[in-house]
Amino acid sequence: MAEHSAPVLEIDPKYGPFDKHTPMMQQYLRLKSGHPNTLVFYRMGDFYELFFEDAEKASRLLDITLTARGSSNGHPIRMAGIPFHAAEQYLAKLVKLGESVAICEQIGDPATAKGPVERKVVRVVTPGTLTDAALLSDKINNHLLAIAHLPAKRGAAPLIGLAWLNLVGGELRVMECSPDQLDRELERIRPAEVLADDATLNTIQVDVARTRLPDWHFDVEAGTRRLREQLGVASLVAFGAETLTAALAAAGALLNYAAATQGQSLRHVIGLTVEHESEFIGLDTATRRNLELTETLRGQESPTLFSLLDTCATSMGSRLLRHWLHHPLRDRAIPQARQQAIEVLLGGDWQTLRSTLRTLSDVERITGRLALLSARPRDLSSLRDTLARLPEIREELPQSDAAPLLIELYAALTLPEDAHALLQRAVMAEPAAMVRDGGVIARGYDADLDELRDISENCGQFLVDLEARERERTGIANLRVEYNRVHGFYIEVTNGQAAKVPDDYRRRQTLKNAERYITPELKAFEDKALSAQDRALSREKLLYEELLQKLLPHLAEFKRIAAALAQADVLATLAERAHALSWSRPTLTDAPGIELTRARHPVVEQQVEQFVANDCMLQEARKLLLITGPNMGGKSTFMRQTALVVLLAYVGAFVPAEAAVIGPIDRIFTRIGAADDLAGGRSTFMVEMTEAAAILHRATPNSLVLMDEIGRGTSTFDGLALAWAIARHLLSHNRSHTLFATHYFELTQLPQEFAQAANVHLSAVEHGDGIVFLHAVQEGPASQSYGLQVAQLAGVPQPVIRAARKRLAWLEQHSADTGATPQLDLFALAADMPIVDEGDADAETPDSALADALAGIDPDDMTPREALDALYRLKALASPAA
């Protein structure tokens, strides 16, 4: 991703002597000096122009034409441009590439300017400070995050302070963590842009746009003052942030940077949330990836848990749902309150509520743009129309003492009558997209504007009347009175009628077949009409700016409403999903353990015709389940579904199970799948061991651990030894709730040593040479792994299968004769094994050829003649010497 540094105000010497440049280029270079590492969009008429190296870079990134026009300081000026009305699509592409763009607008009047028109940078668009709807994803929050790294003092450990802001939503959060937790927190927050000093940025492993700030930006005292000023308080004690020195340093740098990019204060940032790791069920990077919460293992958006659940009626709801899925809570009170609300909604008319919610606009983001004075006319009309629906939504929210959360939402959705009345009076029913086009302020809101509009809008009738009078006065029947933008108002007379033109007509334009004239009366009207139109647009722009200012005192009300609407939407959506998918309300309890009855994998269930539900029992006396069975038998699905049921329960949703009783959970760990990290220089086995080490160091008795085939990335001896030792450690030291899938059948002896371990297996049955997976979890270990049958299903060539079958038969016979375990003695016995190549396997016995021939016969699809021929072939195979 692109990296940027903070602005430094000096003219780059590479541009040559400053006084050798033209006045316009001097103006550009002054502006560019404030943004040396940022692309500058320099407004010139209807285009944004880029110059010098900015033009070259933009030409390459945007695939636009690079030209050279004129010269400055004796050299051609390289330039590239984009139409101002198409700027958003180009900005979107640049931001996606991690670039930042300074928007430089004309703020002076070209008609009165002496020299270059006055210009200034009105805002800087960076990946983390997007506010335009066209640049933002509807369903993902866009976070700007700052990192402050405070060195260790007096033997204390060094501290990392994090502060992150959803700029358009106005949500500011802070926390502190240790350096080794930094990447994990960045994976959780998923910022669009990170601010930090050089040393800190060099330690980050996460792929994200980075902006380098000097160390002095991260000052604790300055950060504390800046945050108090932003929140309008004398102390941060009430927020629980007064002692979080590293977080305060990060918050100060964050707020200053965000305000600088917007060119104004952040009026809507009026609250602060302090997060602590202990609030949430811990989900590390591997767990978020393996559970496919919002992204599949292949990096796709679907099918995931989020894509299954997100039938939200509003974008606000979708963003909140995504946040909830990544932040399951340890405290049972909030999830239980959500589940109570869902249960009450299911007993009411949640369908009507969802239908009404679908008509609403994105109040959260409109509020952010309003606070930044960048709200457009249709933002205001959408806000007005959404506010008008609040009484209806309140009526549709069921009220019950059994669901206090719904009562809170009802109160939060009170209509702000003053703000709504103002919007109703001020904004047209269907305003223009941009205020510069006019047609935004409603008639009756301002008498002066109405008068100017009347003059402008009555032009049509005046022209009709004038045309009729002039035809009668001159006797020219085809005389026309018209208007165009270039020549204004005129009277057009064809050349054949030129002799009838009166003396008071003054020629304005000559055409091939006609002449255009102006009269004193028409000129006077033109001056009045065009002046009225211009003055009306100016008046409307002024009124619109005043309207934005009048709405600012209502920001807190709008934010409250947006938060309540988002919650109502998510709860109604989870009710709809529970109804549609036959999910049940879980029971969250103090007693340790996980008891799931007929649980299903929420996503996989939707991808198959028939899903086999399974129970899962983890208690104090049954801490670890050793799961054996064939590949494709469902071991990984069983483990993942258990974790997803637990996660959904602590999100506050209903769960895909007939019943679920779940005790306290502090973290969910997963070690599933095989993947290397070539860029990081780590093999598959190294990745596996790194993840296993993290689990062994951090898992507690209240953690849920999923271990899938640990140790498979090395030799049999090493892998089995490690798997055995890891399972023992989880039982004796971590004592976590553990699902441990393995193909090492030797591990099934573990319950003989530890009473808290139990064997379960995924069942399968052989059918001829094939295998049928039953996907049912049963007590006890599996009898075999069915590896050859799975290989056959995968399409491994028959000669390879036959060779493997012969080698397996020898291993099993040797094991029976010596009492050795095939897995343990695999390498020790290598020298004693018979050598069987594929050619030997192909010709090994008539029985194998006969079996292959029989497998290829479909008796139901043969004629009598074909059946007789097949019988002769089989007889020949059975007695080849005949």
Curated annotation (Swiss-Prot):
Keywords: ATP-binding, DNA damage, DNA repair, DNA-binding, Nucleotide-binding. InterPro entries: DNA_mismatch_repair_MutS, DNA_mismatch_repair_MutS-lik_N, DNA_mismatch_repair_MutS/MSH, DNA_mismatch_repair_MutS_C, DNA_mismatch_repair_MutS_clamp, DNA_mismatch_repair_MutS_core, DNA_mismatch_repair_MutS_N, DNA_mismatch_repair_MutS_sf. Coiled coil: none annotated. One of its GO terms (biological process) is mismatch repair. Pfam families: MutS_I, MutS_II, MutS_III, MutS_IV, MutS_V. ATP binds at G629, P630, N631, M632, G633, G634, K635, S636. GO terms for molecular function: ATP binding; ATP-dependent DNA damage sensor activity; damaged DNA binding; mismatched DNA binding. One of its GO terms (cellular component) is cytosol. Belongs to the DNA mismatch repair MutS family. This is DNA mismatch repair protein MutS.
